[in-house]
Every structure is written in structure tokens, then in C-alpha cells.
């Protein structure tokens, strides 16, 4: 789903790709970095019993390690890492359309940053 919708070659996953889940959370762009509090994404997952968190980007030594450790302990947790650019792109597309009528006569265009990573 995410690969198709965001035109990506790869979506990173931590956890069991086949696990069943009933609660999914989303932290787009840099929100999954914790907004100044590295522990925030883990606290959100625990407080709201989120099984799968869809993230923009992560701090690997905290969120990645937390979800990986939780999986190894048999907890139902997973992480889908879509990337900063891809998760914020829809907002940038909207912003270009929103700006056009506010500044008539000035060209406003959305420029697709595309998936910045190449995978070997």
C-alpha cells in the first residue's frame, strides 16, 4: 500500500511483516524523532497500545531498538519507516494549491523531491 501510494521502491519494516494488528499510529516527517523527546514515540506506542507505528524518520538507537527488542520479547509491535520526504509530501502539495489564490500573478508549483535514497 505505502510503496504504491508514495511511489517508493522500498519501505523499511522492523517487526514481523505478517503480524496481525488492530491499532496503527502515524508520526509523519520528523514527528517520529520525538519532537525534542526521543522517548516520546515509545511512550505513545505504550500509552495507546499501538501495534504498528508508521513513521517518517526515526532515531535508530531508540525507536528502532525499542521495537526490535519488543518483538524479540514476543510483544506485538512493528514499525514501518516511510521516510521524511514521502510522509510530508502530501502537505506540500496541498500548500502549493492553498497558496495560489493568495498570491495571484505569482507562479506557485509543487516540486516532487522524489524518494531520496537509492538501494543497492
Residue ranges and their predicted role:
Residues 1-120:
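Active-site catalytic microenvironments in core metabolic enzymes, especially phosphate/sugar-handling
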Amino acid at each position: 500500500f505505502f510503496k504504491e501510494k508514495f511511489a517508493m521502491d522500498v519501505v523499511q519494516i522492523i517487526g514481523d511483516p505478517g503480524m496481525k494488528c488492530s491499532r496503527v499510529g502515524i508520526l509523519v516527517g520528523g514527528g517520529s524523532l520525538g519532537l525534542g523527546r526521543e522517548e516520546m514515540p515509545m511512550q505513545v506506542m505504550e500509552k495507546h497500545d499501538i501495534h504498528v507505528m508508521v513513521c517518517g524518520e526515526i532515531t535508530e538507537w531508540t525507536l528502532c531498538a525499542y521495537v526490535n527488542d519488543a518483538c524479540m520479547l514476543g510483544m506485538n509491535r512493528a514499525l514501518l519507516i516511510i521516510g521524511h520526504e514521502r510522509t510530508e509530501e502530501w502537505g506540500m502539495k496541498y500548500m502549493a494549491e492553498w497558496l495560489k489564490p493568495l498570491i495571484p500573478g505569482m507562479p506557485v508549483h509543487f516540486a516532487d523531491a522524489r524518494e531520496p535514497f537509492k538501494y543497492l
